[in-house]
Amino acid sequence: MACMHQAQLYNDLEELLTGPSVPIVAGAAGAAALTAYINAKYHIAHDLKTLGGGLTQSSEAIDFINRRVAQKRVLTHHIFQEQVQKQSNHPFLIFEGKTWSYKEFSEAYTRVANWLIDELDVQVGEMVAIDGGNSAEHLMLWLALDAIGAATSFLNWNLTGAGLIHCIKLCECRFVIADIDIKANIEPCRGELEETGINIHYYDPSFISSLPNNTPIPDSRTENIELDSVRGLIYTSGTTGLPKGVFISTGRELRTDWSISKYLNLKPTDRMYTCMPLYHAAAHSLCTASVIHGGGTVVLSRKFSHKKFWPEVVASEANIIQYVGELGRYLLNGPKSPYDRAHKVQMAWGNGMRPDVWEAFRERFNIPIIHELYAATDGLGSMTNRNAGPFTANCIALRGLIWHWKFRNQEVLVKMDLDTDEIMRDRNGFAIRCAVNEPGQMLFRLTPETLAGAPSYYNNETATQSRRITDVFQKGDLWFKSGDMLRQDAEGRVYFVDRLGDTFRWKSENVSTNEVADVMGTFPQIAETNVYGVLVPGNDGRVRSLNCHGRRRDRVDIRFAALAKHARDRLPGYAVPLFLRVTPALEYTGTLKIQKGRLKQEGIDPDKISGEDKLYWLPPGSDIYLPFGKMEWQGIVDKRIRL
């Protein structure tokens, strides 16, 4: 990686082995001591384990893929059916107190699969959109579509209006199959969808259980599916202002899910609890599909709840829980309970555990392993940290000598101009590698061999190409931009710093600043908008902040109640701006790009706000934006006010 130079590492190793500072030792004890010292300093054993694990393109992974292709069994459905053959009565799913064995769940989704064929005439390779909250039926629909060789468009059930219509049209589907519980989000869009030939069907438990045809789906239906075929779309917010569909190929899903299962060493005795939404890759791939590969049990919650989380974990006897960073903080902020340590959890697996939460979470809930993953649905490459002690607490990876020897020119941290979010270049026009402990954007090298597997956005070549950059270190080279700021310390520990650009995370969701700005900009009294995320004490992610100025006659007299209603009627709850900064004029760069750097740095601390700018906020439970001053700020700092 950029922060540790290969030549220096070799020099260090040579000095270690030959320099006068190393005492002369003899015999087995001396050799063992020297080996231990080298291992501790250069993380040799850690690198060997990492490079041989499931998350690297090892020979074992290649053999697995080749074997599945030869067998013509490359789908998750095929893996599931093999578990049915091996352990038909073993529990696959626990949901709201009910348990399905692998055999029972197979029979259930087979009935759904036959309905898709018999009633809807869904074809092999056809895309079908499913929209709904976490439920057994949602999983049945996904596996049923997989079983018949169709692809699944996983819609975010929070979406409505233009965002929902955009996602449905993007995936070019004939059918949207939606949970009856979110009918209110779907029906306002029915007219426009039906005009383009899209049909809407609703499901609930009674409908799914009433389906009669349980004829096994013939293997011949899916035997010709190729690895590069589309298996699904998972949506992410981006700088275009509307969600983008990340293309999940059959090969990527097979390789990723097997790799995670292998890396975590998932077994039939494992039970993984998740309350993450099934339309996200976290619950879909990092939990459900990976557990299927391992033959274990998925413990699914409908959604996160302080009251239900630990009781469900305890009752299900889960030994692994899945988290995102915010979840750890929410649980810590909850009242202490006898359930806190009454569970059997040995590992918390997820991404985004914040440094101020990490050790407090482990200590309070007595969880030995915090297993942090750095990856993204639309990203390339991944990092992991299986943390069991203080040395690697709070980081996303540990890189040693062997890793740097092999990958230092494949993954590189480069310096960034944080005002423009552009890569800084030297006088020759090439990127500048970061020094030790210097934050920079992570770039992943693209070669002819890796280009085919690089992430892409469905039907959006412009967005796909925007993640790639050329002439980074030499003319003609090609790299993938992660969009994330990371840093590496002198010990080889890698830390997540922040997200770049026009997307930030809040409550496990990616929020597009352009999408929010477009919606808020249609309010009659607002002339221009600048949306950005600000850090708030005691909260993970960034809170939505809207910098705006009114039309001249309305500069002061903005109707704040109407503005709040305007936002809530048109945006998902997690995207509604919580803070307003009303200013006489927006600031632009020389190339007419809106300035965000100073606004992000000043945040919502009233003492840092200068000039004529005024702050407002939307308090929890309020229907109107109210003035935000020192008293409200102190309430957030003291954690008396929670967002």
From Swiss-Prot:
<feature type="transmembrane region" description="Helical">
    <location>
        <begin position="139"/>
        <end position="159"/>
    </location>
</feature>
<keyword id="KW-1003">Cell membrane</keyword>
<keyword id="KW-0067">ATP-binding</keyword>
<dbReference type="GO" id="GO:0005324">
    <property type="term" value="F:long-chain fatty acid transmembrane transporter activity"/>
</dbReference>
<feature type="intramembrane region">
    <location>
        <begin position="250"/>
        <end position="318"/>
    </location>
</feature>
<feature type="binding site">
    <location>
        <begin position="235"/>
        <end position="246"/>
    </location>
    <ligand>
        <name>ATP</name>
    </ligand>
</feature>
<dbReference type="InterPro" id="IPR000873">
    <property type="entry name" value="AMP-dep_synth/lig_dom"/>
</dbReference>
<feature type="topological domain" description="Cytoplasmic">
    <location>
        <begin position="160"/>
        <end position="249"/>
    </location>
</feature>
<feature type="topological domain" description="Cytoplasmic">
    <location>
        <begin position="1"/>
        <end position="15"/>
    </location>
</feature>
<feature type="short sequence motif" description="FACS">
    <location>
        <begin position="477"/>
        <end position="525"/>
    </location>
</feature>
<keyword id="KW-0576">Peroxisome</keyword>
<feature type="topological domain" description="Extracellular">
    <location>
        <begin position="37"/>
        <end position="138"/>
    </location>
</feature>
<dbReference type="GO" id="GO:0044539">
    <property type="term" value="P:long-chain fatty acid import into cell"/>
</dbReference>
<keyword id="KW-0436">Ligase</keyword>
<keyword id="KW-0547">Nucleotide-binding</keyword>
<dbReference type="InterPro" id="IPR042099">
    <property type="entry name" value="ANL_N_sf"/>
</dbReference>
<keyword id="KW-1133">Transmembrane helix</keyword>
<dbReference type="GO" id="GO:0005811">
    <property type="term" value="C:lipid droplet"/>
</dbReference>
<dbReference type="InterPro" id="IPR020845">
    <property type="entry name" value="AMP-binding_CS"/>
</dbReference>
<dbReference type="GO" id="GO:0005524">
    <property type="term" value="F:ATP binding"/>
</dbReference>
<dbReference type="GO" id="GO:0004467">
    <property type="term" value="F:long-chain fatty acid-CoA ligase activity"/>
</dbReference>
<dbReference type="GO" id="GO:0009898">
    <property type="term" value="C:cytoplasmic side of plasma membrane"/>
</dbReference>
<keyword id="KW-0551">Lipid droplet</keyword>
<keyword id="KW-0445">Lipid transport</keyword>
<keyword id="KW-0812">Transmembrane</keyword>
<dbReference type="GO" id="GO:0005778">
    <property type="term" value="C:peroxisomal membrane"/>
</dbReference>
<comment type="function">
    <text>Acyl-CoA synthetase required for both the import of long chain fatty acids (LCFAs) (C14-C18) and the activation very long chain fatty acids (VLCFAs) (C20-C26) by esterification of the fatty acids into metabolically active CoA-thioesters for subsequent degradation or incorporation into phospholipids. The transport and fatty acyl-CoA synthetase activities are genetically separable and are thus independent activities. Esterifies VLCFAs in the peroxisome matrix. The VLCFAs are actively transported into peroxisomes by a PXA1-PXA2 heterodimeric transporter in the peroxisomal membrane.</text>
</comment>
<feature type="transmembrane region" description="Helical">
    <location>
        <begin position="16"/>
        <end position="36"/>
    </location>
</feature>
<protein>
    <recommendedName>
        <fullName>Very long-chain fatty acid transport protein</fullName>
        <ecNumber>6.2.1.-</ecNumber>
    </recommendedName>
</protein>
<keyword id="KW-0813">Transport</keyword>
<feature type="topological domain" description="Cytoplasmic">
    <location>
        <begin position="319"/>
        <end position="643"/>
    </location>
</feature>
<keyword id="KW-0472">Membrane</keyword>
<dbReference type="Pfam" id="PF00501">
    <property type="entry name" value="AMP-binding"/>
</dbReference>
<dbReference type="InterPro" id="IPR045851">
    <property type="entry name" value="AMP-bd_C_sf"/>
</dbReference>
<comment type="similarity">
    <text>Belongs to the ATP-dependent AMP-binding enzyme family.</text>
</comment>
